[in-house]
Every structure is written in C-alpha cells, then in structure tokens.
C-alpha cells in the first residue's frame, strides 16, 4: 500500500490542484487489491464523477482512524515524505504492526518520465526563458529596484507569448545575492554589484 499526500503529486495523478492546508488529504493505493481511494475533507467536494472513490472526513472526525480502516494491519506501507507528522504518528498508533517506508520515490520516479508533448512544452519554455534573460540583462543597469525588475520580467514573458512565471523570480543585487532564497525588495544595484536572476516561465 502507498499513501500520497503531496498536493503537487495528487495534482499530477488527478489533474486537480488542491491545497488542504492543515486538513487531511491523501490518495491511498492498495496495489495488491488494485484499488485507489481519495480521503479528503468535505470542504473539497469532488463532484459527481470523481476519478476514484472518495471518503469525506469532517474537522470533528478522527480522520486518521477513518483512513486506517482502509489500510491493512500488517505488511509494508509507503508513506509520502511530505505527510504531516501529526497524521503519520496517529496512523502508527492505530497500525503498530505495519512496516513504514518512504514511498515518495515511486511517484517521484513516475513524474520524471515526460511524454513527448511535455518535453516539447519544456523545450519551448526554456527557449522563451533564454530570450527573456537576454532582454532582462539589458534592464539591470537602468535603476530598477529588485521588485520592479521582477515586474519588468513578467512584461517580457507576456510579450514573448509566455503564460508567466513558473515560480516567483529572484532578482537581487549586491549583498542580497548571497541569500539563496532572497525575497525581492526595494534595493537597487550599483556599478560593480553582483546580480542574480533566478527565473523561469510557463
């Protein structure tokens, strides 16, 4: 059996991006039985024709106890590397005879395999990004703040026909470039500063 909880992985498998926050959302795969089921808060209705059977849980429920009823009492179970400890620890209480393993490598490996269409999208996004970098470099010495430079990049992406950012860009000058996850601010660059442009498009 395998529990998948990462919203990006569930989106990959179901084609629907949902962010449950602190609430339970898991896909349970029972490979031996050939069954898959979604266990999710009732705040996220799946419509009349969900891909797989759905069990809804309420905030007042012991949602992991409900989940545990779908899981064997013995054997090996793969757990999503991103599953919150509060859920995992409760499941370990309810199913102490299971052997728990990191099961994320299964979905991670599957997601690495790209269709021809997906490969074409990635190649095109890379091409557009290369063009955007060429144009953005010419804007670096014009006195824009880091935030303004990011705004300029979005204009460039749209002008090139891109949908926009694949992630919010990091545009930083000088000392800010030493922070690998810097949040763009109102800093401006000066002659001799290092510049980092960590960007990507869709």
Model regions and ranges:
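N-terminal accessory/capping or targeting/presequence segment of soluble
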Residues: 1-69
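Short beta-strand segments
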Residues: 4-5, 30, 80, 172, ...
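Short catalytic-site patches enriched in acidic/histidine residues
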Residues: 10-20, 104-107, 144-202
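A general structural motif
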Residues: 24, 33-35, 72-76, 97, ...
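Generic preference for hydrophobic
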Residues: 38, 54, 100, 170-171
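A short local loop/turn or secondary-structure capping micro-motif enriched for an aromatic residue
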Residues: 45-48, 87, 188
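Flexible, acidic/His-enriched mid-domain "rim/lid" segments that flank
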Residues: 62-165
């Amino acid at each position: 059996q395998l529990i998948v909880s990462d919203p990006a992985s569930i989106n990959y498998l179901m084609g629907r991006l949902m962010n449950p926050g602190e609430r339970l959302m898991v896909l349970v795969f029972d490979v031996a039985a050939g069954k898959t089921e979604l266990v999710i808060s009732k705040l996220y209705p799946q419509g009349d024709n969900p891909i797989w059977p759905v069990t809804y849980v309420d905030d007042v429920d012991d949602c992991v106890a409900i989940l545990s009823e779908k899981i064997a009492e013995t054997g090996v179970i793969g757990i999503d590397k991103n599953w919150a400890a509060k859920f995992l620890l409760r499941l370990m209480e309810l199913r102490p005879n299971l052997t728990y393993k990191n099961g994320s490598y299964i979905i991670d490996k599957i997601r690495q395999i790209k269709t021809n269409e997906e490969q074409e999208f990635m190649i095109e996004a890379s091409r557009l990004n290369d063009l955007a970098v060429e144009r953005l470099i010419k804007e670096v010495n014009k006195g824009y703040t880091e935030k303004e430079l990011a705004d300029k990049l979005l204009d460039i992406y749209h002008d090139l026909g891109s949908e926009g950012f694949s992630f919010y860009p990091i545009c930083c000058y000088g000392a800010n470039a030493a922070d690998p996850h810097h949040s763009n601010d109102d800093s401006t660059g000066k002659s001799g500063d290092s510049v980092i442009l960590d960007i990507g498009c869709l």
